[in-house]
Amino acid sequence: MQKNDLVTVAIEDIGVGGEGIGKVDGYTLFIKDAIIGDVVEAKIVKAKKNYGYARLMNIVTPSENRVEKPACPMARRCGGCQIQEMKYGAQLAFKEGKVRGNLERIGEVPTELLDKVMQPIVGMEEPFHYRNKAQFPIGTDKEGHIITGFYAGRTHSIIPNTDCALGVAVNQKILEIILHFMENNHISAYDEEKHKGLVRHVLIRYGFKTDELMVCLVINGEKLPHAEKLVDKLCKISGMTSITISVNKAKTNVIMGNEIKLLWGQTYITDYIGNVKYQISPLSFYQV
């Protein structure tokens, strides 16, 4: 196999990064966005001695477990979701099989014992819009427009998207308010290569039991100009409880700074796990 070869591959497995795995004449290929059961046409982009990587060019025969349309139109470009093309039930079966296989192969747990003690994987009633926390990088596109979204896989290139299918629906409204505020008031986005610009990230938290909302802007400075204009828009959103800034002037990939400054409301939101009440600040660990 050589780079740029065009091959037809039947996908038999999925790798740890969500890439489809298939073989051509015994040669293993890893193909992003292909799922188990697909027969695809792929172009080899990197060829090593015993395996290679290929780009999905065409789906010859789709898997019976392939969805017609992923929930997020950015799924293939964004680095956040790897197997959104697969039906949710098939995702669960794949994950359960991966855990079982690792326990047998790596942990050397006898199959007979697993058959007795391993319970079926428990899925969610709603596998979208379930995350109570999201962190969105802020940047600019080639035309200089301020954008937000998530990074493309293994890059720091932002795929513009304010409507992530994993976060709560109100995130989109919050992000669009912030983007408009920045554009209208000439607030710069942070450039991590030049270490210039002000707004680095936006952190949003939501309490599913309390409906409380938190917005925290991470900035490369001590102050957010015209903050009162942003607060005036955000505080009108139902459930808004906390609006803060996080000061992070370090040249680092660490998102949050240690200093939190209050703009409006309080510095935390509350939520419950069972009967236990939690106070959650911008810096708190709280399972997403």
Residue positions per predicted region:
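Accessory RNA-recognition modules of RNA-modification enzymes
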Residues: 1-288
